[in-house]
Amino acid sequence: MDQNPQSQLKLLVTHGKEQGYLTYSEVNDHLPEDIIDSEQIDDIIQMINDMGIPVVEEAPDADDLILNEINTDTDEDAVEAATQVLSSVESELGRTTDPVRMYMREMGTVELLTREGEIDIAKRIEEGINQVQCSVSEYPEAITYLLEQYDRVKTGQIRLSDIITGFVDPNAEEIFPPTAIHIGSELLDEQQNNEEDEENNQEDHEDDHSIDPELANEKFSELRIQYNNTNNTIKNKNRTHKDSLLEIYNLSEVFKQFRLVPKQFDHLVNNMRHMMERVRKQERIIIKLCVEICKMPKKNFIKIFPIKKINYLWFIREQNTNQPWSENLKKVKEDVFISVKKLIKIEEETGLTIEQVKDINKRMSIGEAKARRAKKEMVEANLRLVISIAKKYTNRGLQFLDLIQEGNIGLMKAVDKFEYRRGYKFSTYATWWIRQAITRSIADQARTIRIPVHMIETINKLNRISRQMLQEIGREPTPEELSEKMLIPEDKIRKVLKIAKEPISMETPIGDDDDSHLGDFIEDTTLELPLDSATSESLRSATHDVLSGLTAREAKVLRMRFGIDMNTDHTLEEVGKQFDVTRERIRQIEAKALRKLRHPSRSEVLRSFLDD
């Protein structure tokens, strides 16, 4: 039937209510083709029976039918019950174990975004990242690290694009028109960075074209000045002073204008997170010693433990009290003091109190969660775009689900790099990244023998030029001609041509009968050829016959000297020891035996085995 399962079931129920019954054959005729499980069929029949529509083997008598019709008509809730049961049947029919169908069904529950919705989510992502950057800016080591990295840029040790991808003007509103150049340049940078991983000896490339060096110098100078002002204010006054708080706010406003490279951003965040882990580790040790070992009530510990400024006084006061746990505290005093000392060291390293470290980490975590939720919304709303692009790349060596996964990776990168102020829609921007991720994965994974992506690009370029030259000169170009055309050394052209060959299966059939395969015609170089085996056997037999014409002593000397029927040959001294004679005597016996073998009657037999 052309109708969908829901329509077929509705038609079946309607038909049953009209005639007052259903036969098993009618149910079977109206069931969808994908319902073949006996349990599912029994469930559907039971549901129909529960609706007041009997399912019988044969059509009932007229009297029984009238009674059934009366019962059905008097049931006012029949229609509502039918709807509920039908919805449960539909949910049963909708279930599937196919991962692609399950993925697409879940994907279809998310609504598409409008242009305004995209901008709203992008702003929430930016707010979350800004909150993280503002939190990190209060960590002095983060600003110091960033300024040190810029000093390395000035000395030529690293590129500016290794630190930042640009700057954000919070007052700007979509001042750039939609353009493909910006997207292409970002993709090129991404591709070049990946190729550097594949081949470390490639020349460095300049990819700072999207960042104005003068603007960067101005922004970093502003950051350095504000950082110094903030430090001086904190040193001269307290960190909690209103002037210090104002300077910290100004520093965060300057710092959040920097669009950091994800690697650098993660480095700063991880440093702060690592610092927090060190704090928690020492606090857990102190809690374990005081609460678990010394049996101090946790409520008491929370009350006496210093939050704003770590010191030893709280412990000293507590161990001098008359509490039941005071004596136990004296036993763990040394271990507690070690952990407290480490916490004080963290305060000295960061220039922050433990309370401030926790507060910064809390605000940073909230910002990360906010950005993560917004990114998740943006990704889920654009999964259909990945499907539509992935469909165009099927049958190229990767399964459809793999293409979707690779496209989703590209989509997530697009979400990370999307700039709503530039004016283009997210789908326009994301298409480039999704396509690049899919094509790169095909180039990287589709071949049985993996070839680096940059080499595949060279192969494609060579094939394109080769086809072009074939049309121009009417024959396949030689490696020398390709080298001259592509401005690549000839040895590299030959290497590329060798790599470009596709592997052939050993089971490839040969001929029309399919009774022989390619592997049958490939020489096995590890085995001895029948001709060589026969020649060796004949030579061995002829050698034995010739040696049998010598004396036993002469034959044994020659066998040992030349390693005939032995694992190895022997020196004159080794043979002499065997016969208990001198080396000179063995040499004389050998010379005499060889003279006998050179006689034409004996040498003629062996001469035929010599290669021409």
Curated annotation (Swiss-Prot):
A motif (Interaction with polymerase core subunit RpoC) lies at residues 402-405. InterPro entries: RNA_pol_sigma-70_dom (IPR014284), RNA_pol_sigma70 (IPR000943), RNA_pol_sigma70_r1_2 (IPR009042), RNA_pol_sigma70_r2 (IPR007627), RNA_pol_sigma70_r3 (IPR007624), RNA_pol_sigma70_r4 (IPR007630), RNA_pol_sigma_70_non-ess (IPR007631), RNA_pol_sigma_70_r1_1 (IPR007127). Residues 572-591 bind DNA. Residues 457-533 are annotated as: Sigma-70 factor domain-3. Residues 546-599 are annotated as: Sigma-70 factor domain-4. GO terms for cellular component: cytoplasm. Pfam families: Sigma70_ner, Sigma70_r1_1, Sigma70_r1_2, Sigma70_r2, Sigma70_r3, Sigma70_r4. Keywords: Cytoplasm, DNA-binding, Sigma factor, Transcription, Transcription regulation. GO terms for biological process: DNA-templated transcription initiation. Residues 191-206 have a biased composition (Acidic residues). It is found in: Cytoplasm. Residues 191-210 are annotated as: Disordered. Residues 378-448 are annotated as: Sigma-70 factor domain-2. One of its GO terms (molecular function) is sigma factor activity. Sigma factors are initiation factors that promote the attachment of RNA polymerase to specific initiation sites and are then released. This sigma factor is the primary sigma factor during exponential growth. Belongs to the sigma-70 factor family. RpoD/SigA subfamily. Interacts transiently with the RNA polymerase catalytic core. This is RNA polymerase sigma factor RpoD. It comes from Buchnera aphidicola subsp. Acyrthosiphon pisum (strain APS). The lineage of its organism: Bacteria, Pseudomonadati, Pseudomonadota, Gammaproteobacteria, Enterobacterales.
